[in-house]
Regions:
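Extended ligand-binding groove/face enriched in aromatic
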Residues: 1-31, 41-42
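CBM-like carbohydrate-recognition segments
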Residues: 16, 96-213
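Noncatalytic carbohydrate-binding groove/subsite architecture in carbohydrate-active enzymes
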Residues: 22-23, 27-66, 72, 77-93, ...
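Short clusters of hydrophobic/aromatic residues that line enzyme substrate/ligand-binding pockets
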Residues: 4-6, 62, 113, 218
């Protein structure tokens, strides 16, 4: 197979892999945007070409099996390449790859992002996808149909996680691997699951507080923090912790 690619690791025989090529493509695009050095754009395009010609599938999968973090990283890489070059092929792919993660049953369970595993890296996958999905939603040049779908899906996932958090246990309030069920107290808490849950709530909050989201036609609730009282609120306005006043 001809083209520029990176191996999964340094072991002999390690071949090209979406988990290295996707972030490499994204990083090269970001470096070009930062420094304007043409070689970075050349690398980004070559990584994109290898991914689309040899690894990504025509139905929207970035790899087999499809994993949320590579759907997100390669989708974000495509979005940035569109803004750099103005070429519509990148815009089209960005929408297809990120939308797949939220709408296809290979990445979802009962309409929510699925449980992808309990290891430290697997439990972090959704933490990678979420900010890139929100970036897509807030990008006025991306397809409005995909943006509307993603805004709704992100809110649905955030609502499910919030419903299943044991808020009475705060601050020992742990996120589950799958947001459609409560954290199992018989199991050790996962920092990866916590990172994914925090990424979801933080980035949905960012999405809800941005004016461009309103242009999608989707109403998004948001509760601004009360900086004077120090109170801590949830996205739906529930008081989590009473602040102290001096």
């Amino acid at each position: 197979e001809k083209g520029l690619w990176l191996p999964w690791n340094t072991d002999n025989g390690s071949g090209p892999n979406a988990c290295t090529l996707s972030p490499a493509c994204l990083m090269a695009a970001k470096l070009y945007m930062k420094y304007g050095t043409e070689k970075y754009l050349d690398y980004a395009k070559k990584f994109y070409d290898y991914m689309t010609n040899h690894i990504a599938k025509s139905d929207g999968r970035v790899e087999e099996p499809p994993l949320t973090y590579t759907q997100g990283t390669f989708g974000e890489a495509c979005r940035l390449l569109y803004h750099i070059t103005g070429e519509s092929k990148y815009k089209m792919k960005a929408g297809v790859y990120i939308n797949y993660a939220f709408t296809n049953g290979r990445c979802t369970h009962n309409g929510l992002l699925r449980h992808e595993g309990t290891s430290m890296d697997q439990s972090l996958f959704k933490a990678v996808l979420i900010p890139y999905a929100v970036n897509f939603c807030l990008d006025e040049e991306m397809q409005i149909t995909y943006r509307r779908t993603l805004v709704t899906a992100l809110q649905k996932n955030a609502d499910a996680l919030w419903k299943n958090l044991d808020k009475q246990a705060y601050p020992k309030m742990y996120c589950p691997y799958y947001w459609g069920e409560a954290y199992n107290t018989a199991e050790a808490a996962s920092m990866g699951a916590m990172a994914s849950g925090a990424s979801l709530l933080e980035n949905v909050s960012r999405m809800c507080n941005d004016r461009t989201t309103q242009e999608t036609g989707i109403k998004v609730p948001f509760m601004a923090p009360d900086t004077q009282s120090g109170n801590v609120y949830s996205l739906d306005g529930t008081l989590l912790r009473q602040g102290t006043t001096d």
